[in-house]
């Protein structure tokens, strides 16, 4: 498997990040929705997918790695956020965010987020 690419040329996708938020609907009742926070360039690297059995049905899941430049905005992302690829509309449930270069000269430049499609967001 090829090593992941880093750099401006490798950031081929526009990723929109949203945070879960509670707002009042037109009747004053609390309603949970997504609040868009920011959009950044990023890369999507697919990993080996799998199928899980949920309630006696197969559910296809595709894990991916989202790579983005580290910034004050991207440092805020946690596991209760979601990412959406702007062009296709594919939604990703974020599982974790890490710095892949801890202990190297590129430490602090990039974030890799393990995420999944095909699961509830």
PLM-predicted stretches and their roles:
Residues 29-121:
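Short, conserved turn/kink motifs that form compact alpha/beta structural patches or helix kinks used as
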